[in-house]
UniProtKB/Swiss-Prot annotation:
GO terms for cellular component: cytoplasm. Its EC number is 2.7.2.8. It comes from Polaromonas sp. (strain JS666 / ATCC BAA-500). This is Acetylglutamate kinase. Substrate binds at residues 78-79, 100, 202. One of its GO terms (biological process) is arginine biosynthetic process via ornithine.
């Protein structure tokens, strides 16, 4: 009998009959067994956060992972929502090497949007889908301690950029995350750290997800983005990248802008022992389940060697 498949190009199950749906579920069983009890850190961002149908799909997928025995941890971004809030205030966003320049007023907006709006929307959707989500920032339980990021110019190492209240992670204490996992909750984390004087720092969500995956000894780090994965200059998907290949892509300018911190966070996690790191297309319905519960080669896998 021909085996039913669901691919990134054809993720819709509406045309699949009951028997084939059962077969698809059976194909997922080995992965459910393999990853039972394992931590999956998911960076949630891009269009998947702004399209209502994709928002609902994401929440359902996270709940499903929890119900079958995995431990999903969500780290979310919120760039479009921050940009919209700043525009309403008449402030124009400015980025250097993929990082948002964050003055004091912008930091207040970032904190309000991420922790007060975006995070609560995600928590509500997961709870509505049958999960038990709890929102956290870096302040909660001393989760993320940070300091001002010193950004060195990628073309001139002698030059530094002052990008304001953008943070560099000093340490992560995962105690509160582990406690929530043990009680069957799903942590939803806003990428805001706190400094020695209790000041807030805006930290790139991809970087937070990578560091958290390392500290939690996660089985997988999955980064949802607005592209099929990492693309070469011809627009072709690169399905597998090593550290050496990534260095070459940095050098020739293939990887730039917002993809820079994403790749850096992914590579850091891979080098630090996270078994599997993937950058996938969050615009595809149920993309996360396709990655975790099927054998489809999907997106870009990042390897340390």
């Amino acid at each position: 009998m021909t085996q039913p498949t669901v691919t990134a190009d054809d993720p819709d199950l509406s045309h699949v009959g009951p028997r084939d749906k059962a077969e698809i579920l059976a194909q997922a069983l080995p992965y459910i067994r393999k990853f039972h009890g394992k931590t999956m850190v998911i960076k949630y961002g891009g269009n998947a956060m702004t399209d209502p149908a994709l928002q609902a799909d994401f929440a359902e997928d996270v709940v499903l992972l929890k119900l079958v025995g995995m431990n999903p941890v969500v780290v979310h971004g919120g760039g479009p929502q921050i940009e919209a809030a700043l525009n309403r205030l008449g402030k124009k966003g400015h980025f250097i090497q993929g990082m948002r320049v964050t003055d004091e007023e912008t930091m207040e907006v970032v904190e309000w949007v991420l922790a007060g709006q975006v995070q609560q929307d995600i928590v509500g959707l997961i709870n509505q889908a049958g999960g038990k989500a709890v929102g956290l920032t870096g302040r909660d339980g001393g989760l993320i301690r940070a300091q001002k990021l010193k950004m060195v110019d990628k073309d001139d190492p002698a030059k530094e950029h002052d990008i304001g209240f953008v943070g560099d992670i000093v340490s992560i204490d995962p105690s509160v995350v582990k406690a929530l996992q043990d009680d069957a909750f799903i942590p939803v984390i806003s990428p805001i750290g706190f400094g020695e004087s209790n000041e807030s720092y805006n930290i790139n969500a991809d970087v937070v997800a990578g560091k958290l995956a390392t500290v939690l000894k996660a089985e997988k780090l999955v980064l949802l983005t607005n592209t099929p994965g990492v693309l070469n200059k011809a627009g072709e998907l690169l399905t597998d990248l090593t550290a050496r290949e990534i260095d070459d892509l940095f050098a020739d300018g293939t990887i730039s802008g917002g993809m820079l911190p994403k790749i850096e966070g992914a590579l850091d996690a891979a080098k630090s022992g996270v078994n599997s790191v993937h950058i996938i297309d969050g615009r595809v319905p149920h993309a996360m389940l396709l990655e975790i519960l099927t054998d489809q080669a999907y997106g870009t896998m990042i390897r340390s060697h």
